[in-house]
């Protein structure tokens, strides 16, 4: 079931300048989530998801001309932020399934490919969790809490990545006079890679070609053969628009990575292994503070899995400052303490599926990081051999430690 928002509510725009709101209403797919407590149990929430602004059509007001070209913003329509906002209109998405997003109750499936007009189209959908109001993002404060979800990764071959992570995006998506669309239309994305998000940044025109930096907690980057989780601290709070060389020093793009295979547990995760990817998996991530309070300093990130009524612990040690001490820049950029500060302020859940045309996902599942061969991650190989690749996330819940799962 989908939640329809009137076009007059808000507009979306690719991470930069949000334009005016068009006439096509946004139709957010509902994704039921759960808030859990030690005493009260888990209570359902009427939340939904929204596609990133870059998936939306943004065009000249009163015309069909796109406000972007193959090389970025159309300079005749968007010479600056203010003019761009006045000239351009963002339209809603009515059919999320055509973008590879399908929902059913408390489950969401993301598809990499879809046959359109007789040809296979690559989709790579990325969606953000909206609060029950459908206007702002759901920002979770997870210090001394846990975040849990079920995942079916069985249809993700080598070279694919079905990800669920947290981003310190603004709750409103950067809503402003120049960005009336805001979170309702998927504006405001940022992560620790500080990549240039394209024509838009925080819902405004990205006329400077800035990168969008913010703290990122990768809860789950995985396919059926390999998995990692990793915190990525930054020296700044919230979205920071970087330029030039500073884009490589604001955040820890590498992060402190926990990869069971890389740590020597080669028979731990995969088809028919200890964590069996042929079956649905319950993934639990706990953010433990030094004093076991919601205001304490993040001291440890624990991971456990539940399958067929059994709890499966970490394959090796837990993630602590000591574990992360050898990471490239993790400690210098604030380490677990800085990551914990972002978790305390609140972070937005992000769901995505993608391939890797540049590195073929070797950093996740090959070259010592996993068992995949050197050519299995080639996107052309994946499309030819696994056209139905997809990931399903379900039963997303968060709350007090040990309150979100049972055995």
Swiss-Prot record:
Task: Identify the catalytic residues.
Answer: 216 (nucleophile), 221 (proton donor)
Q: Which InterPro entries does the entry mention?
A: ConA-like_dom_sf, Glyco_hydro_7, Glyco_hydro_7_sf
Leader peptide range in chain numbering: 1-18
**Alphabetized Gene3D superfamilies for the sequence:** Glycoside hydrolase, family 7, domain
Record has Metal-binding as a keyword: no
Name the top EC class.
hydrolase
GO MF terms held by the record:
cellulase activity
| Catalysed transformations (reactions) | Endohydrolysis of (1->4)-beta-D-glucosidic linkages in cellulose, lichenin and cereal beta-D-glucans
Please give the Pfam families that the UniProt record associates with this protein.
Answer: Glyco_hydro_7
Q: Which cellular components does GO assign to this protein? A: extracellular region
Keyword annotations for this protein, in alphabetical order, are: Carbohydrate metabolism, Cellulose degradation, Glycoprotein, Glycosidase, Hydrolase, Polysaccharide degradation, Secreted, Signal
Where in or outside the cell is it found?
A: Secreted
- Provide a GO biological process annotation: glucan catabolic process
**Domain of life according to the entry:** Eukaryota
Question: Which Enzyme Commission number(s) are on file for it?
Answer: 3.2.1.4
Q: What does this protein do?
A: Has endoglucanase activity on substrates containing beta-1,4 glycosidic bonds, like in carboxymethylcellulose (CMC), hydroxyethylcellulose (HEC) and beta-glucan. Involved in the degradation of complex natural cellulosic substrates.
Q: What family classification does the UniProt entry report for this protein? A: Belongs to the glycosyl hydrolase 7 (cellulase C) family.
This protein is called what? Probable endo-beta-1,4-glucanase celB
The source organism is Aspergillus fumigatus (strain ATCC MYA-4609 / CBS 101355 / FGSC A1100 / Af293)
Q: What lineage is this protein's organism placed in? A: Eukaryota, Fungi, Dikarya, Ascomycota, Pezizomycotina
Q: Gene name?
A: celB
